[in-house]
A protein has these predicted regions:
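Short acidic-glycine-tyrosine-enriched beta hairpin
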Residues: 75, 104-126
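Ligand-binding loop in jelly-roll beta-barrel domains
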Residues: 115, 124-151
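Glycine- and acidic-residue-biased ligand/ion/polar-headgroup-sensing regions
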Residues: 86-107, 116-118
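Short, surface-exposed binding/anchoring microloops in extracellular/periplasmic proteins
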Residues: 56, 62-87
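A short, N-terminal "cap"/entry segment at the start of jelly-roll beta-barrel domains
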Residues: 2-4, 8-9, 16-67, 112-113, ...
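Short histidine-centered beta-strand/loop micro-motifs
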Residues: 81-86, 103, 111-112, 132-133
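Active-site or metal-binding loop neighborhoods of secreted/extracellular toxin and effector enzymes
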Residues: 150, 154-158
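Conserved hydrophobic/aromatic beta-strand scaffold that supports enzyme active sites
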Residues: 70-72, 91, 111, 119-121, ...
Length: 166
C-alpha cells in the first residue's frame, strides 16, 4: 500500500514538473503564417560542418545529419517567435522587413539586426533565442533546419531565460 502511494505521489510530482515546463514556455505572438514548404531525408550519410565568424573554434558539427526542413515564416510588426531552440543548425534568410535576434546566453541582451537580403546561421543544438519584428512592416524569413529528427520537432519552445526586459 505504501509503495502504491509513493508511486502515485512520484507520478504527480513528475506530471507537475512536466506541466510546469510547458507553463513557463514562451510561445510566439503575431505569427501571420509559418508554412513548411519542404521536408526531406538525406539518402546518404551527411556529416555537416558550419564555420561561423571565421573563428576556427566556432564550428557547428552535425555528424550523421537527419532530416532537413524548409519553412517560410511571416511575423507581423510587434510579433515574435517566443523563446525557443532547434535540434540542429538553421540557415535563415530575410526576404522582407527586419528581424531582431536576441541570444538567451547574452546577459546584456544585445540585439542583432538582420534586414532583407541578409542571412545568418543559428547554431541550434539547444541554443535558446528569440526573434522579434520590431519594425513597422511584416517580417518574411525563410529557414532551412538541419538535423531534424525524422517526423520530430524542428522548433522547441523554451522558457524565458530572464536576460531581456521585454
Amino acid at each position: 500500500m505504501a509503495k502504491r502511494q509513493l508511486a502515485r505521489a512520484a507520478g504527480v510530482i513528475l506530471l507537475g514538473t512536466a506541466l510546469g515546463g510547458v507553463a513557463l514556455a514562451t510561445p510566439g505572438s503575431g505569427i501571420v503564417s509559418a508554412t513548411v514548404v519542404a521536408w526531406g531525408t538525406f539518402q546518404d550519410t551527411v556529416d555537416l560542418k558550419l564555420k561561423v565568424g571565421g573563428n576556427p573554434n566556432d564550428v557547428i558539427h552535425v555528424p550523421g545529419a537527419q532530416d532537413t526542413v524548409m519553412q517560410q515564416v511571416i511575423i507581423a510588426p510587434g510579433g515574435h517567435t517566443g523563446w525557443h531552440s532547434h535540434p540542429g543548425p538553421v540557415v535563415v534568410l530575410i526576404t522582407s522587413g527586419t528581424l531582431t535576434f536576441y541570444d538567451g546566453d547574452d546577459l546584456s541582451c544585445s540585439p542583432r539586426t538582420y534586414s532583407a537580403g541578409d542571412a545568418f546561421v543559428d547554431s541550434g543544438q539547444g541554443h535558446v533565442h528569440i526573434a522579434r519584428n520590431e519594425g513597422s512592416t511584416n517580417l518574411v524569413l525563410w529557414a532551412t533546419f538541419f538535423d531534424v529528427p525524422p517526423g520530430g520537432p524542428f522548433r522547441i519552445d523554451r522558457q524565458d531565460p530572464g536576460n531581456c526586459s521585454f
